[in-house]
Amino acid sequence: DLVGINMEGPFISPNKVGAQNPEYVQGADAGMFRRLQKRAGGLIKLVDVAPEEPGNLDFIKECHNEVRISIAHTCTDYDTAVQAFEAGATHMTHLYNAMPGITHRAPGPIIAALEHGAEVELITDNVHIHPAMVRFTFNTFGADHVCLIADSMMACGLPDGQYSLGGQAVTVSGPRATLTEHPGTIAGSATCLYDCMKRAVLEMNVPLESAVRAASENPAKSIGIDNDYGSLAAGRYGNVILADKELNIQAVYQKGTRIV
């Protein structure tokens, strides 16, 4: 089932596009968002915004009651990030990636997110973030505020080779995807979410319970679908993965029916 769409662009910084096509970047536009939301049948659950760009704080103020706002692909400083959270942003997309880091005189958006109780995403493919930073994030933000993501692109589950992302050529080798013309630029990942959760536990020493919650219940809560998804409870869909002690998948159930 398609339960939500993350609108990661185009309301981002032209200086932090990552692997997105810079030709499509623009200022946040409430009218455009609403047209897309109508075409999507209300499935857009998250809109990514660089708050420092002209007019983008106004977009957050206007639209935060219609959709969750996430700070992403940004050059924002601490003070502007604080304004964004106070205006209604609640989320940070792929924390540490495509944003300023933390220094003692320029704490940046990461510390602003911590102080405002934001939900933060981590790509735990062992490519995007060092394992020590993953553990640091769980310990500082708390296991109930971390959402594991794969940030996977079209090559997920496919052989190594050449692929496309937003009209740009991408080279995939193992879990790593990079822009072919700019090999130093990561272009999402080629890893599925379950493998990211597994790596968090087995390679990064994240407690199993914390990793499972961060890959299921927390993301569902962060986009407001936790009445139906994200945990096992009466009235919710019976979507379950059964695994052995080494986290190898043994069975998959979708809405109570075994499919694997």
Q: What residue ranges belong to the model's regions?
A:
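His/Asp/Glu-enriched, well-ordered alpha-helical/loop segment
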Residues: P109-E121, F138-A150, A155-R236, V240-L242
